[in-house]
Amino acid sequence: MSFDLIIKNGTVILENEARVVDIAVKGGKIAAIGQDLGDAKEVMDASGLVVSPGMVDAHTHISEPGRSHWEGYETGTRAAAKGGITTMIEMPLNQLPATVDRASIELKFDAAKGKLTIDAAQLGGLVSYNIDRLHELDEVGVVGFKCFVATCGDRGIDNDFRDVNDWQFFKGAQKLGELGQPVLVHCENALICDALGEEAKREGRVTAHDYVASRPVFTEVEAIRRVLYLAKVAGCRLHVCHISSPEGVEEVTRARQEGQDVTCESCPHYFVLDTDQFEEIGTLAKCSPPIRDLENQKGMWEKLFNGEIDCLVSDHSPCPPEMKAGNIMEAWGGIAGLQNCMDVMFDEAVQKRGMSLPMFGKLMATNAADIFGLQQKGRIALGKDADFVFIQPNSSYVLTNDDLEYRHKVSPYVGRTIGARITKTILRGDVIYDIEQGFPVAPKGQFILKHQQ
């Protein structure tokens, strides 16, 4: 058989091992894995490189339509491709209108036409005002539903996202359980975090350390415990978003050991930044839950290596620079990070801490694909989409603003020395990013719908 593409001599991350092996691609799918595979229209030599499954980033905010001055499909997905992401799962906020019904998700699809450099799946929102319309989003093909039990949304904008109270969460989770859909939750205690934040502002405590103190670990842990129990009673599969503390992870592990269907994610910034660095970087490193102290970070690394955290995600949530101005308590909370998930974590987890390549592949791609039912994504195996990223190990560079593809070229990682580089990203057999050529093909990304899997 003649193939479209053969990738030779790379160290390939397979599901349970990593070895030097060749990969053949035909029709955008992985057609063969082995040695002496025959002829192909194109042959790539990956000698000295790690060939990983393309990252499945299960937590991104692209903000289009309605807030494309924050980020947009064109810039956001180019940045993703440059960072080794081949599939993103987009959140139902920060765009306007929020993605909470059939009409609003159709606006998303229209806004993305011709702009997707990578493939994308979409989440629907569970908000205070759409519990009777959740079925609309399920019918369209979302792969899950996101909600906040922490305060969110601009109350001055009618169609912005809204948090849910316990009753709304419970009723929504019951309906999602019936639909076979997972509920994804931002877990922080709204009343306590809001009150502590207002108290700090009144007293003039506006440093990074003050912000972290206003959203203490117990507010995350309490919220995780609460939604775990409510989701269990409601009969709904639960995914806990962006866990920032080992104590929070422990709650998920305990529930899992008791038989509950629950998964969790965390983000690179909780592993590579701490509160002192947050103070130095300033508002660009503000997010919620917040970046915590070094002792907390050490605990997170232990949980990651123990296999208690299912996947790593960017929680890419940028905004215009003027929204990051002023003191930390007042600035927008969100980190621009999807372009540097893979290289930063390969450096920090694999090169500096000895994580195995198969574990890295599971955390960055396989587990997220499995959690959200993306059957063609997340692993290098026969019949799967030919989505790959080439990583050059032990190749240091200093990230600059000019390296970034975001609409606003800012990131808390600017100035950081990163000890690995993404050299090529391949989506369904086509190179969508190359370190020398840039972006050699027109955007070819597609939306992935649940009922098409």
Curated annotation (Swiss-Prot):
The modification N6-carboxylysine is found at residue 146. InterPro entries: Allantoinase, Allantoinase_bact, Amidohydro-rel, DHOase/Allantoinase_Hydrolase, Metal-dep_hydrolase_composite, Metal_Hydrolase. GO terms for cellular component: cytoplasm. Its EC number is 3.5.2.5. Zn(2+) 2 binds at residues 146, 186, 242. CDD domains: L-HYD_ALN (cd01315). Keywords: Hydrolase, Metal-binding, Purine metabolism, Zinc. Binds 2 Zn(2+) ions per subunit. Its cofactor is Zn(2+). It holds the Pfam family Amidohydro_1. Zn(2+) 1 binds at residues 59, 61, 146, 315. Homotetramer. Catalyzes the conversion of allantoin (5-ureidohydantoin) to allantoic acid by hydrolytic cleavage of the five-member hydantoin ring. Belongs to the metallo-dependent hydrolases superfamily. Allantoinase family. This is Allantoinase.
